Amino acid sequence: MVLLSKPTSEQYTYVRNNMPITFSSSIPLVDLSKPDAKTLIVKACEDFGFFKVINHGIPLDAISQLESEAFKFFSLPQTEKEKAGPANPFGYGNKRIGLNGDIGWIEYLLLTTNQDHNFSLYGEDIDKFRGLLKDYKCAMRNMACEILDLMAEGLKIQPKNVFSKLVMDKQSDCLFRVNHYPACPELAINGENLIGFGEHTDPQIISILRSNNTSGFQISLRDGSWISVPPDHSSFFINVGDSLQVMTNGRFKSVRHRVLANGIDPRLSMIYFCGPPLSEKIAPLPSLMKGKESLYKEFTWFEYKSSTYGSRLADNRLGNYERIAAT
């Protein structure tokens, strides 16, 4: 049973919602089995920093099994879940997102992909959950590399693995997160929606999101307006991260996104974050510069990751590394 306390206006952030939530039909769709996938990926990254993928090759029964085990974990007594925490940064956490005061209607597991055992609960069910997580993380890495290779092909740059090699590296800093947003009928307060996870961009190269069929995920368009992404439990959604924005010298833009809590149904999302090795230098790729001036100062992934720990979710974290304003 989930024991998050009732939301109060002092704890959480609300978003005014005078209109019923409508889902956008403009989300870019990429069929990974089609030859035009590489072209569509580049256009989606340029226009939205976000796209949906189908025909991804991940068995739906494996996804459903992991989702079921995740729900079992989050239904454990609070004292049991907290044995896997606190999230500092890895493990179980709830409400608090990061170290700088961000709060959300959420509980979560944050795991590193470089260790087989990185949360401390044990038991038959938990061992099954852990095994499914390991298999899923491997599948996500393979999908990420396929997408990143298609991206490089679409950009007409060599080598083809210029992005994916950073994910395949044994020292890669990839992370996996399972977010649970409990249902809470009390959320319909004065026509407002409760923030489950506040607006932010992901600092990594790309992130791969999959959720159950519960709504709540939104992305921000270039004009600053928010659109709701239709849930689809059989597909995956790709976010461009800050690191990829820098590597493409601003041609691709990291997508600002957030989650609004659902008052009726619980939402469960699983996100694979593709991070490079900590020592990797992040800078615009020479093959994409073509005589253009670099918009960003070079930094290591460790430097940028460290800076994110000292910031709030909504901060423009790339601002400290801009040479001239990215347009």
From Swiss-Prot:
GO biological process: one example: gibberellin biosynthetic process
Reaction catalysed by this enzyme: gibberellin A1 + 2-oxoglutarate + O2 = gibberellin A8 + succinate + CO2
A Pfam family that the UniProt record links to this protein: 2OG-FeII_Oxy
Family annotation (Gene3D superfamilies): B-lactam Antibiotic, Isopenicillin N Synthase, Chain (2.60.120.330)
Gene behind the chain: GA2OX1
Record keywords: Dioxygenase, Iron, Metal-binding, Oxidoreductase
SUPFAM superfamilies: Clavaminate synthase-like
Database matches in InterPro entries: DIOX_N, IPNS-like_FE2OG_OXY, IPNS-like_sf, Iron_ascorbate_oxido_reductase, Oxoglu/Fe-dep_dioxygenase_dom
Keyword field contains Iron: yes
Sites where the protein binds Fe cation: 200, 202, 257
Protein's recorded name: Gibberellin 2-beta-dioxygenase 1
Keyword Metal-binding listed: yes
EC identifiers of the protein: 1.14.11.13
Stated role: Catalyzes the 2-beta-hydroxylation of several biologically active gibberellins, leading to the homeostatic regulation of their endogenous level. Catabolism of gibberellins (GAs) plays a central role in plant development. Converts GA9/GA20 to GA51/GA29 and GA4/GA1 to GA34/GA8.
GO molecular function: gibberellin 2-beta-dioxygenase activity; metal ion binding
Expressing tissues: Predominantly expressed in roots, flowers, young fruits and seeds.
UniProt family annotation: Belongs to the iron/ascorbate-dependent oxidoreductase family. GA2OX subfamily.
Pathway: Plant hormone biosynthesis; gibberellin biosynthesis
Cofactor(s) the protein requires to work: Fe cation
Top-tier EC class: oxidoreductase
Sequence ranges assigned to domain Fe2OG dioxygenase in this UniProt record: 171-276
Stretches of the chain forming a coiled coil according to its record: none
Residues forming the catalytic site: 267
Disruption phenotype annotation: Plants display to the slender phenotype, characterized by large amounts of GA20 that cannot be degraded, and is metabolized to excess GA1 on germination, producing plants with a characteristic slender or hyperelongated phenotype.
